[in-house]
Amino acid sequence: MNPRKKVDLKLIIVGAIGVGKTSLLHQYVHKTFYEEYQTTLGASILSKIIILGDTTLKLQIWDTGGQERFRSMVSTFYKGSDGCILAFDVTDLESFEALDIWRGDVLAKIVPMEQSYPMVLLGNKIDLADRKVPQEVAQGWCREKDIPYFEVSAKNDINVVQAFEMLASRALSRYQSILENHLTESIKLSPDQSRSRCC
């Protein structure tokens, strides 16, 4: 029996202030929900180990602050990430309207810039009654960008695990693809090496 492969992945969670990024992360990692709101300044990091197929994944998940004044500082944390959760609050239209900016910030920091960079969108706080962003509108935004969409509740633990593990799965696939391409490139012979030489 083959031992499990071990892979470390860096994931980030971004979005406007107050959308519940920290609550989503704590629900996923610790199965807890805190009623009191505290603003994340800069970034905090939580880790979780999961098993996907024959691979043990160590997820290092960076929870980034959503305050406008810290955006340039926070965006430095995006570098080297393997995937991103974009989050908005379904009761806050402005948080949804800001998604293009957040997505653009993330993609601008990814090296190399790739269309295949994995993202998922989470519409949080579906447990609240005063919804402002219709599900169809969020789904339409995601269809345009080919991003999976999850309606979630950090408070009631609805779809949180599914969303994070969808991102982890996509990030792992991308990681494996990059690794395979790198190995293929390193095996190819250069033109000089491919010609047989006589002494």
From Swiss-Prot:
Its main location: other. The keyword Protein transport applies. A lipid is attached at residues 198-199 (S-geranylgeranyl cysteine). Pfam families: Ras. GTP binds at residues 15-22, 34-40, 63-67, 124-127, 154-155. GO terms for cellular component: Golgi apparatus; late endosome; late endosome membrane; lysosome; phagocytic vesicle; phagocytic vesicle membrane; trans-Golgi network. A motif (Switch 2) lies at residues 67-82. A motif (Switch 1) lies at residues 28-41. Switch 1, switch 2 and the interswitch regions are characteristic of Rab GTPases and mediate the interactions with Rab downstream effectors. The switch regions undergo conformational changes upon nucleotide binding which drive interaction with specific sets of effector proteins, with most effectors only binding to GTP-bound Rab. This is Ras-related protein Rab-7b. It comes from Homo sapiens. The gene is RAB7B.
